Each structure stands twice: as structure tokens, then as C-alpha cells.
């Protein structure tokens, strides 16, 4: 869970689960690059930067969700509240592919 408030404009807000996408190898900065998780909506099936996650015992989500890679941001480690789960290798690979789409890296 990550506290994403306060925000400005269309930034995603409130305390919510997120996927940390930055590498631990960069450990010198007190920041993490995160992608927030939000509720699934059928219209997201055609949005290339939304990666669907189904709830399971590894990610510990309680409902069908999506990782919103268009809302990538760096946050202070002080915003990280607790670790609630992980994504699997296949899911993380899909997240990395969606990140490439956001940055135009094909």
C-alpha cells in the first residue's frame, strides 16, 4: 500500500496497492518508481498501458484489478505503508512491456 495523496489534477490518489517497478540495484536513492493498481473496468481491455491482475494468494488483491502504467511516478520511501503482496514473473513481464508502450519504446 502506498499513500499517493496529495495529488494534482488527474493524478491517481488515495492509499492503494502499487507495483514497485524500480530496481533495488539503484539503492542509493530514497525513492521508488511505482505503478498504482486500480479497479478493473471492461473498457481497460483495449488500453495497452493497463495490465490486468486477478486476485490470488501471491498478490493478495481482493478483486480483479489493473496496473495503470500511465500513472508511473517516483515516490519517497516514506509513502510506502506496507507490503501486501507480489506479482508473478509473467505479470511483471507484461507490466514491463506496458511501460515500454508508455515511453514509446517498441
Predicted regions and their residues:
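Short, conserved beta-strand segments within well-ordered enzyme catalytic domains
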Residues: 1, 33, 68
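Short, flexible segments with low predicted structural confidence
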Residues: 5-6, 40, 66-67
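Hydrophobic alpha-helical segments
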Residues: 6, 15, 95-96
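Compact nucleic-acid interaction/catalytic patches
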Residues: 10-15, 20-55
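C-terminal terminal-subdomain/extension
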Residues: 56-106
Amino acid at each position: 500500500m502506498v499513500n499517493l495523496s496529495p495529488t494534482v489534477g488527474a493524478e491517481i490518489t488515495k492509499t492503494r496497492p502499487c507495483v514497485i517497478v524500480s530496481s533495488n540495484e539503484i539503492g542509493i536513492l530514497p525513492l521508488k518508481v511505482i505503478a498504482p493498481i486500480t479497479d478493473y473496468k471492461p473498457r481497460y481491455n483495449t488500453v495497452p498501458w493497463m495490465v490486468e491482475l486477478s486476485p490470488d494468494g501471491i498478490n493478495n488483491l481482493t478483486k480483479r484489478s489493473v496496473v495503470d502504467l500511465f500513472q508511473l511516478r517516483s515516490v519517497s520511501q516514506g509513502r510506502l505503508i506496507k507490503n501486501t503482496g507480489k506479482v508473478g514473473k509473467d505479470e511483471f513481464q507484461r507490466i514491463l512491456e506496458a511501460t515500454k508502450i508508455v515511453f514509446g519504446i517498441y
